[in-house]
Amino acid sequence: MAHVAEWKKKEVEELANIIKSYPVIALVDVAGVPAYPLSKMRDKLRGKALLRVSRNTLIELAIKRAAQELGQPELEKLIDHIQGGAAILATEMNPFKLYKLLEESKTPAPAKAGAVVPKDVVIPAGPTSLAPGPLVGEMQALGIPARIEKGKVSIQKDYTVLKAGEVITEQLARILNALGIEPLEVGLNLLAAYEDGIVYTPDVLAIDESEYINMLQKAYMHAFNLSVNIAYPTKQTIEAILQKAYLGAKNVAVEAGYITKDTVEDIFGRAIRAVLLIAQNLPEDLLDEKTKELLNAQAQMAVAAAPQPTEEKVEEAEEEEEEEEASEEDALAGLGALFG
């Protein structure tokens, strides 16, 4: 039986204890992260999460041990996501907040041949600080719309040179570095996170917050409207349901002419409007003074509510009238000439 170093046993035990002590356990890839950015990340996570870098094999053993001791076999599914330079990130933060924190903590990094870009790389349109040289030919060979303008290299339009997930070539790395474009990111890449028996992967955690909030708002409004329409009372909808019921009952009472303190004004208002409608078609000598006053007031309200022509429209109308008058005069002159 092979001898296992004591420090490895101790490391596995410590890792397992960390895993058992936190509700959320994540795996992050620290491979390729320089010492200084990693140190800054530790500082940022202090008080929020515990980062423990170790060997992949020891992390795997620790996960198995913790899963067995906790009685949570689902935890072992994390092992499938161990890759690169894995490290354990233990926290009480929910996986979605943790993923957002890690993504926001990443900083841009220069292009490096052989590296995979995390997102589309676009060379923006506009002038650059590059002087004419062989690089222009290399750009054009790759389809980049570059040309010389005023002694400098200028990009004619936005051009996508790499799609997310593609690899940077040596030639493209040289061009991007010359242009000062940093397509890479330095930070901790979350590989997977475990909470309450569920393993979350980055594609699940990478949500569009604004879109998600919009979806929740729409769902809330649909549920609210449905609750009101079927008269299902809740704390949120009871007021709207009562208002709807009140207005419905009031409208029925008004239509039926049933007088109450809430309907009397509407009923008499309808009656007066009906009387005035009839009065408009009667001879004026049959109307009393009060009815005439009401008809005049109604007419004034209608005039006040009608849209007034603007000064420009009035001027245009006057110009049109002048043109019409001129054309009429021309026509009369023409007739006069015709008949001598």
UniProtKB/Swiss-Prot annotation:
Transmembrane segments: none annotated. The keyword RNA-binding applies. Keywords: Ribonucleoprotein, Ribosomal protein, RNA-binding, rRNA-binding. InterPro entries: Ribosomal_protein_uL10, Ribosomal_uL10, Ribosomal_uL10-like_insert, Ribosomal_uL10-like_insert_sf, Ribosomal_uL10-like_sf, Ribosomal_uL10_arc. Residues 304-340 are annotated as: Disordered. Residues 313-331 have a biased composition (Acidic residues). GO terms for cellular component: cytosolic large ribosomal subunit. One of its GO terms (biological process) is cytoplasmic translation. GO terms for molecular function: large ribosomal subunit rRNA binding; structural constituent of ribosome. Part of the 50S ribosomal subunit. Forms part of the ribosomal stalk which helps the ribosome interact with GTP-bound translation factors. Forms a heptameric L10(L12)2(L12)2(L12)2 complex, where L10 forms an elongated spine to which the L12 dimers bind in a sequential fashion. Forms part of the ribosomal stalk, playing a central role in the interaction of the ribosome with GTP-bound translation factors. Belongs to the universal ribosomal protein uL10 family. This is Large ribosomal subunit protein uL10. It comes from Thermococcus kodakarensis (strain ATCC BAA-918 / JCM 12380 / KOD1) (Pyrococcus kodakaraensis (strain KOD1)).
